[in-house]
């Protein structure tokens, strides 16, 4: 989803290696991928914890780039800057994007999402784009689309938003239970939380060591324990991005993780 919109806008997505512990974009690798054509950095706060936003924002300022946070899996997550200031993910970059798909930590009854920004001009344009480009009804200033949040979804989310902290606390409690149960098991690496970030556990994702993942997946299914692979094929290896030079990337950490991760139920 993160890269689809880039391609739909006829822009070129450029993939960067991830941190082997957090699964988020490796800030140390970003500058190597920047060219004179680069317009924005899009960090994805994967599985429920933040990318290294302080370093990313410094790189963006240095190269005069926008930062668009994909916060779909980390709503409610706290990022701590080196000066001790804490800020919610999705509010650090120029724009923050989140999803209200039912499986998300703050999910609606169907599809939906939201954008966050402190930039009044960006907010003005976004409000027009999501409403057919209208500045006022029937007066279209720019090309837009119908991306308004349905009233039903808004009503449900209005109630659930008040309970978001409780939902996150329950997920953390479940993660602690898993961590205790798996302690000492050398074939399982439990989720790592970087010192600069909170973890809201949208997914509880393990890294397996010398384990037959498909066999484990089958065994769990036979015992009525759902498990999922997020994600079996990394974005740079998807056929849809072949025309963008996807096959030219050398991202060994990403490839290795995609072969070894498995996610267990958490809610």
Q: Where in the sequence are the language-model features?
A:
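Structural signal for conserved beta-strand scaffold positions within catalytic alpha/beta enzyme cores
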Residues: 15-17, 98, 192, 229
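PLP-dependent aminotransferase class I/II
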Residues: 28, 32, 40-44, 49, ...
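Short glycine-enriched loop/turn motifs at secondary-structure junctions
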Residues: 106-110, 197-200
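Substrate-binding/gating loop at the entrance of the active-site cleft, primarily
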Residues: 1-28, 46
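Active-site phosphate-binding strand-loop segment of PLP-dependent enzymes
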Residues: 21-108, 114-116, 263
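Histidine-centered beta-alpha loop that forms part of the nucleotide-sugar donor binding/catalytic region
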Residues: 11, 18, 72-73, 101, ...
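Conserved SAM-binding loop
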Residues: 15, 115, 206
């Amino acid at each position: 989803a993160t890269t689809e919109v880039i391609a739909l806008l006829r822009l070129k997505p450029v993939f960067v290696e991830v941190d082997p512990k957090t699964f988020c974009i490796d800030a140390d690798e970003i500058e190597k991928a920047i060219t004179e054509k680069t317009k924005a950095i899009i960090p994805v706060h994967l599985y429920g914890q933040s990318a290294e936003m302080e370093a990313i924002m410094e790189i963006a300022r240095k190269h005069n780039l926008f930062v668009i946070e994909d916060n779909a899996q980390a709503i409610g997550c706290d990022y701590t800057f080196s000066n001790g200031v804490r800020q919610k993910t999705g509010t650090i970059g120029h724009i923050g994007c989140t999803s209200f798909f039912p499986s998300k930590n703050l999910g609606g009854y169907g599809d939906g999402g939201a954008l966050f920004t402190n930039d009044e001009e960006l907010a003005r344009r976004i409000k027009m784009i999501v409403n057919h480009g209208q500045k006022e009804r029937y007066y279209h200033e720019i090309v837009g689309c119908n991306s308004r949040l349905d009233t039903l979804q808004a009503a449900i989310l209005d109630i659930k938003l008040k309970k978001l902290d409780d939902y996150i606390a329950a997920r953390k409690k479940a993660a602690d239970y898993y961590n205790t149960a798996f302690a000492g098991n050398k074939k399982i690496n439990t989720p790592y939380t970087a010192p600069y970030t909170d973890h809201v556990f949208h997914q509880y994702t393990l890294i397996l060591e010398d384990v037959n993942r498909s066999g484990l997946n089958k065994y769990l299914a036979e015992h009525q324990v759902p498990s999922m692979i997020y994600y079996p094929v990394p974005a740079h290896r998807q056929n849809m991005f072949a025309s963008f030079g996807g096959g030219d990337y050398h991202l060994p950490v990403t490839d290795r993780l995609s072969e070894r991760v498995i996610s267990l139920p958490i809610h």
